[in-house]
Swiss-Prot record:
UniProt keyword annotation of Nucleus present: no
UniProt GO molecular function: acylphosphatase activity
Hydrolase in keyword set: yes
Enzyme class: hydrolase
NCBIfam families tied to this protein: PRK14451.1 (NF011022)
Reaction equation(s) it catalyzes: an acyl phosphate + H2O = a carboxylate + phosphate + H(+)
Family, similarity comment: Belongs to the acylphosphatase family.
Protein keywords: Hydrolase
Annotated Acylphosphatase-like domain residues: 4-89
SUPFAM superfamilies given in the database record: Acylphosphatase/BLUF domain-like
Lineage: Bacteria, Pseudomonadati, Pseudomonadota, Gammaproteobacteria, Chromatiales
Gene behind the chain: acyP
Entry EC no(s): 3.6.1.7
Organism encoding this protein: Alkalilimnicola ehrlichii (strain ATCC BAA-1101 / DSM 17681 / MLHE-1)
Protein name: Acylphosphatase
Transmembrane domains' residue ranges: none
Amino acid sequence: MNESRRFLVSGTVQGVFFRSSAKRHAEQLGLSGYARNLVDGRVEVLAHGPTDALDELAKWLEEGPPNAQVTGVEVSAVGEQPPEGFRVL
């Protein structure tokens, strides 16, 4: 079953290639969506795809790329479905 989730990732997540790494990981999982920086220092990831792939992405987001220091991930289900592909905004 496909669904969409929004992840808000806190910590040292900007300036450490978090968005591009999230894009690469999401694409490997076959997810569509986007990753973007927020003005408050967090990264927002909206992803759509199979539940098991979203669960895998959620696990990865808790760690992020090597230079990131993730302190929290807020997850919410959303009704919107992003366009095909995964983008860095």
